[in-house]
Amino acid sequence: MKKILLLIFFSITQLVALHSQYSIRGRITDSESHEPLYGVSIFIADLKTGAATDTNGNFTINNVPQGTFLAEIRMIGYASKAEPISSKPNSAWNDSTLLRIELLKTPAEYHPVIITGVSGSTERMRNPVPTALNTKEHMLKHSSTNAVGAIAELPGISMVSTGNAISKPVIRGLGYNRVVVLRNNVRQEGQQWGDEHGIEIDEYEIDRIEIIKGPGSIMYGSDAMAGVVNFLTPQPVAEGKIGGEIATGYQTNGGLFGSSIMQEGHLHGISWQVRMSQKLAGNYSTPIDGYIANTGFKEYNGSGFIGLNRKWGVSQLSFSTFNQTIALPEGERDSTGMFLIPIRINDTTAGIQALSNDELKGYDYSLGIPFQKIGHHRAVLSNNIFFRNSRLKLDLGIQQNNRREYGNVLAPEEEELSMKLTTSTLNAVYFFPETKTAQLSAGVNLQHQSNLNEGEESIIPDYQTNDAGAFVFFRKYATKWFFSAGARSDIRLINSEGLYLDSTGITADSSAYTTTKFSAFNKYFVSYSGVAGASYQMNKHLVWRLNLSRGFRAPNMSGLSSNGKHEGTFRYETGNKSLKAETSLQVDLGTTYTSDHFNLEISAFYNSIQNFTYLTKLNSTFGGDSIADPSDPAPVYTFVQGNAALFGGEIYSDIHPHPLDWLHFENSLSYVQGLLLNQPDSMTNLPFIPPMKYQSEINAHAEKEIGPLKNAYFMIGASRFFAQNKVYSAFGTETATPAYWLMEAGTGADIINKKGTVVLRVFFSANNLLNTTYQSHLSRLKYAPANPLNGRQGLYGQGRNFSIRLVIPVNIK
């Protein structure tokens, strides 16, 4: 596969252009003073190229094909802008034909461009599909411990967490295999069915995150029922630039230290970027339990790309490697409340040791037994090839996820569980010749997966899956209307291999076995999905949106065949081979109002799901928990299905009153309720639905420079997580969670030299400012064993945490 990627890459570079040189040139000024703006970023996502304005506000983008493209224009302190810009032959440009663009001085995000789930770059405000966006600037101002934590505070978004290192996105109450995670528009596949399986993406490499709420995209096939999260890395810098950055950060709670170094450039149509980063964290502390044993992690990552921009289009070969070791807390304590950890007494004897709060500080006990090692490596070749009036987008990728778990204190290097998942993907989209008001595209997605178990134990079988899908998508523009519609067909083929054990638990062939761990089977699933939506721009301030979509999710191997307990979880899971494919029908209604001093977004949805798959706890014949392995007494859960409905919505407002344009008052409210239909009272609520969430933030920013400080800001915010009493209480599957408040604050600025160049960016923040004792309803540690000293169930959320981040821009050329 790697040879194929390289062959295609070098073959494309030999294509010969058949038309003359085209370019894009323009000038950007302040909308009030009409002064030229220096350092404005102009980026065309469909071409993976852009430019930055010079001291006269001018910019030039060379080596582009003929056509009109949607550009995103951004500068800190100004409203971003989506602008359609057209290329012309080099000889056609002069001072009178330059593009004239003005930016409004405000930090509000008015018209960002999105590229996720649509056939081409689209202005977010006009897209009928509900979306959310998080930028690098926002992530720098709001600290988190992992990539998913950076989006969990957005309206309608939550996360399932297991400590500080492991988090999984939840969109409007749905997560796991119902959320497709992308890295630069290509699926990230890493055994995402597991509670303690996080997202293998380096937080430092993220430039922005785009989110689709619901099955509104037909571009990605099975599993996108809840939506899509697309982690986008920085795009190539402007032609002629060479630079980079050095970033570092420290958090006081747990001692998390991270750093990253990046170098990039773009010369003569060849762009490149290389990044290396690392993180190290010890045990974190909570207000009620002090330091929590075995909650540290360490991480070493690398990524980069090399790209080629020519008249025929763009080709980019990217790579990434993610390497993480995570300690898995078990929460066992003695009668005095001290945490217990397993220790090795001699070669044949294991014991336990109680650790005081002082002993748990630092890093010495942060990576004990049990722990995970995760390696995720991927290479992707992305191509955008332009013809005279059409283009072809082709992505080829290969990735491998190695997930190993260690739980034997007498043999700490013994891999009790080892899963190697290899995924190959092909995504192709052909964009037909478009008119001024319409665009048609069609595409195919192919994916092959192979899972191989190499450890002492297996909780899912060895298997192979093959996915194939085809879709067509249409967009129509009118003066005030925007229409979009699409249809898709998918098939998934599954080949699951059997595993048989003899009386000693050793693998045997089918003729000598005494126990069937996994039985062999073959299955296939076929489904159809579609989307239709419209937006209506009543005036320059107000837009209405309506969208109807049908989603599809084939059962995963965990649901069909799991059989075992995972380290870091508190349950034993068994699969169900009779599971059917889930299908859903969702309707979304929304409106957006934007003005110079007030922004408002309101979204509502209703989602009906057939054959909804969920876990439920099993009771034994004696009425208590069913226990599969008395030596490791975890309760047994199994997968069942039923029809379900989810409904709710989000409200977001941003007030920045005149003449206090430097002040922003942001508020948001998110609500979702999930119901299982035709069930008894204790089983009517969908399990593990996030509670209603209210967030409020006041943000003040300096409009002018203060000595050597530029873009200085101060913010303070509060989040209210309401009580979640609507739980799936049957068999003790889920417990209620009380309400709580969390407060945060932050400040920072860019430090400039005498020439006005930014030499250092500084960001301070404080999370859980009041040191509140709380449990997140979606925390898996909530179900850890109770503390014998006070009877409190589970482990609690991180206490007060101060953070500092430093970013040093490097400008070589």
Could you say what each language-model-derived stretch is?
Residues 29, 40-43, 74-78, 92-140:
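Short, acidic, small-residue-rich periplasmic hinge/interaction motif at the N-terminus
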Residues 62, 186-213:
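Short acidic/polar hinge/loop motifs at secondary-structure boundaries
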Residues 95-102, 147-150, 165-170, 182, ...:
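N-terminal periplasmic accessory domains that precede
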Residues 190, 205-207, 218-288, 294-302, ...:
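Outer-membrane beta-barrel translocator/receptor signature
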Residues 281, 293, 313-385, 400-423, ...:
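Flexible loop and strand-edge segments within Gram-negative outer membrane beta-barrel domains
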Residues 415-429, 574-580, 586, 599-664, ...:
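Outer membrane beta-barrel strand-and-loop segments of large Gram-negative receptors
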Residues 605-609, 626-724:
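Gram-negative outer-membrane beta-barrel transporters
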Residues 609-611, 615, 720-727, 749-813:
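C-terminal beta-signal and adjacent terminal beta-strands/loops
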